[in-house]
């Protein structure tokens, strides 16, 4: 029996996930995987060449993967649907699929690999709770959130890593675990949907701070920063993620010491593939903030950067949440001040040393 899967989003991560699924062989039969891309050149590259040269260059895709620019065609009748677009575009993408019959009737199992928070009338909200407000009631407490210490470049190359499939529905969590797992991709199930979502979003904020500190160190901007300083930042960052997670309803403390917590934070901060780390480094190396007035100006012109650092929007929302819940989060709040041009990078780094209170 053929398993039908739609991946809505043809960026690097969506493409890598589609490749992993399409390559799996199982006793239950083959997998038909379709990727939705609003960019016709990406769609045509996937269909004609089995490549996504724009977002995941050099990676050959299985022949069983097809692409379409018709989102309803992509989603209709699929057993599994994975939303894989950046947080800035998630709700627009979701709304385009609400008329799909298999979604209206609750027949498709839905998961999300998007990282971040979403704006709402009463302040930023987690991704799944925002989606539940728009999807049919059948999907309440059944959506699956997928995260973990992984980069598209490595997952598509078959490097060993792990993911967590989190859902309030244990059955759906296990279904996505079984869909994604392979000999080189370990997938675990979790019921701590809120803790996993907070970890996935907030770690990008810490990664920008890490990139700033790393560039300061390697470029000789300040001899006070070393490897130990970076480890101190990781510890402080994990502490802030857990503080925020607890405030937003995380249910399992071990979430933050698992691959979805410290594991994802570490690889996001240290990997050369990390876009948020890269953005932090370029704040020092290229002085890119000089082109923008504040964080909203960065977000309004995010296309100019050439890649998407999700931590910029997340920093804005984390600051709002920290103030709302009266949380002490000096790294995240300080980064937001830096992106708003209220302080300079050196002041930001020095303030971190002064404000850390573990």
Give the predicted meaning of each segment.
Residues 1-57, 64-69, 73, 120:
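NAD(P)+-binding Rossmann beta1-loop-alpha1 motif at the extreme N-terminus of oxidoreductases
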Residues 61, 68-160, 176-178:
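Rossmann-like NAD(P)(H) cofactor-binding subdomain of soluble oxidoreductases
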């Amino acid at each position: 029996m053929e398993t039908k899967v739609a991946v809505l989003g043809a960026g690097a991560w969506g493409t890598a996930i589609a490749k992993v699924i399409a390559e799996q062989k199982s006793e239950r039969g083959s997998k038909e995987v379709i990727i939705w891309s609003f960019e016709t050149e990406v769609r045509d590259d996937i269909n004609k060449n089995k490549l996504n040269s724009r977002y995941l260059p050099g990676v050959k895709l299985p022949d069983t993967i097809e692409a379409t620019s018709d989102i309803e065609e992509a989603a209709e009748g699929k057993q599994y649907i994975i939303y894989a677009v950046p947080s800035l575009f998630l709700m627009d993408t979701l709304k385009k699929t609400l008329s799909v019959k298999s979604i209206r009737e609750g027949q498709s199992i839905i998961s999300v690999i998007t990282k971040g928070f979403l704006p709402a009338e009463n302040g930023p909200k987690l991704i799944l709770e925002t989606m539940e407000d728009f999807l049919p009631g059948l999907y309440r407490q059944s959506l699956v959130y997928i995260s973990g210490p992984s980069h598209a470049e490595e997952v598509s190359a078959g490097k060993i890593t792990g993911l967590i499939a989190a859902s309030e529905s244990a059955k759906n969590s296990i279904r996505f675990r079984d869909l994604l797992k392979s000999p080189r991709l370990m997938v675990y199930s979790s019921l701590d949907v809120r803790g996993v979502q907070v970890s996935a979003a907030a770690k990008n904020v810490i990664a920008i701070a890490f990139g700033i500190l790393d560039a300061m160190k390697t470029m000789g901007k300040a001899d006070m920063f070393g490897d130990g300083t970076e480890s101190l930042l990781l510890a402080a960052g994990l502490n802030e993620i857990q503080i925020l997670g607890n405030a937003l309803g995380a249910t399992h403390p071990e979430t933050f010491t698992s691959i979805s917590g410290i594991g994802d934070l570490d690889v996001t901060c240290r990997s050369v593939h990390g876009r948020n780390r890269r953005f932090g480094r370029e704040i020092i190396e290229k002085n890119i903030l000089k082109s923008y007035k504040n964080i909203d100006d960065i977000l309004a012109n995010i296309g100019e950067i050439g890649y998407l650092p999700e931590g910029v929007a997340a920093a804005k929302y984390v600051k709002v949440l920290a103030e709302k819940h009266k949380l002490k989060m000096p790294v995240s709040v300080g980064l937001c001040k830096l992106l708003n041009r209220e302080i300079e990078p050196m002041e930001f780094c020095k303030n971190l040393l002064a404000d850390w209170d573990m």
